[in-house]
């Protein structure tokens, strides 16, 4: 029996969790309980594959115009609720605890002296693995947000370390095989940027069509830009059609 915690701040964690849920479902002797945090329960989507999943507030980050805002992040934290959730999470029924950078499960395991397996991209960011830049806040978050005993890091390259490649959900491809990519159609996924600014930039590019996904967007056509709310099926279909991708996050994209 496994407790599997998933950080819900970014959709890459959810994509990876869906792939893992499909893989683990092939072993009927294994029972998996899923716990998600990092966004409101109502903002999670396409959760049918996780059964009676649990929700906690957890820890998340406030962003604006593509950057983490430390002061706004501190203001939105609920440390009392986090500590209560961490103390009340009973791990005795579970044989294994897994955390994809999910803090409630990770800290509950540390408090109860249980080994927690960390599976995710953040666990690949060890000394010796290149990073674009280092800052004190980012290093602190990586160390303290969801500490684990056993690390299984995922990255595009191993850089001489025991790292695994990204987990891709091959079963989620559209039925009927891959679509023919349109040579001048691009998928745009910039969920932490100002969407109106991005749309204005894209509409100024002639001869191209853009399918833009992001939180808070509605399905509408705005010139050469088709906006969409985030959804698994529509996103994968647009990805199949696109010949180019514009993104600054989404590790499993």
What annotation goes with each model-predicted range?
Residues 5-18:
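A short, glycine/small-residue-rich beta-strand->loop->alpha-helix junction that serves as a flexible
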Residues 7-8, 30-81:
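Conserved nucleotide-sugar phosphate-binding/catalytic loop shared by glycosyltransferases and other
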Residues 67-104:
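Conserved nucleotide-sugar donor-binding subdomain of glycosyltransferases
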Residues 81-91, 217-253:
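Donor nucleotide-activated moiety binding/catalytic core segment of transferases
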Residues 96-104, 108, 118, 237-253:
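A donor-sugar binding/catalytic signature common to diverse glycosyltransferases
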Residues 110-127:
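Active-site proximal beta-strand in glycosyltransferases
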Residues 127-195, 213-216, 233:
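A nucleotide-sugar donor-handling region in carbohydrate enzymes
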Residues 196-229:
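Catalytic donor nucleotide-activated moiety binding site of glycosyltransferases and closely related
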């Amino acid at each position: 029996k496994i407790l599997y915690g998933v950080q819900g701040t970014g959709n890459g964690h959810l994509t990876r969790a869906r792939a893992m849920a499909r893989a683990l479902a092939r072993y009927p002797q294994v029972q998996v309980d899923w716990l998600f945090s990092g966004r409101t329960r109502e903002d999670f989507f396409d959760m049918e594959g996780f059964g009676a999943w649990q929700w906690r507030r957890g820890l998340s980050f406030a962003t604006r115009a593509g950057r983490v805002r430390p002061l706004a992040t501190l203001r939105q934290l609920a440390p009392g609720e986090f500590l209560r959730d961490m103390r009340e999470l009973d791990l005795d029924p579970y044989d294994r605890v897994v955390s994809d950078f999910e803090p409630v499960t990770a800290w509950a395991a540390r408090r109860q002296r249980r080994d927690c397996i960390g599976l995710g991209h953040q666990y690949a960011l060890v000394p010796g693995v290149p990073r674009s830049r280092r800052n004190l806040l980012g290093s602190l978050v990586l160390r303290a947000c969801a500490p684990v005993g056993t690390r299984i890091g995922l990255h595009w390259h191993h850089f001489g370390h025991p790292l695994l490649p990204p987990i891709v959900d091959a079963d989620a491809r559209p039925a009927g095989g891959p679509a023919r990519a349109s040579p001048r159609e691009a998928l745009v996924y910039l969920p932490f940027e100002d969407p109106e600014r991005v749309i204005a930039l894209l509409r100024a590019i002639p001869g191209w069509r853009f399918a833009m996904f992001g939180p808070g967007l509605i399905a509408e056509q705005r010139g050469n830009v088709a906006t969409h709310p985030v959804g698994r099926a529509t996103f994968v279909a647009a990805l199949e059609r696109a010949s180019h991708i514009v993104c600054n996050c989404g590790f499993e994209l």
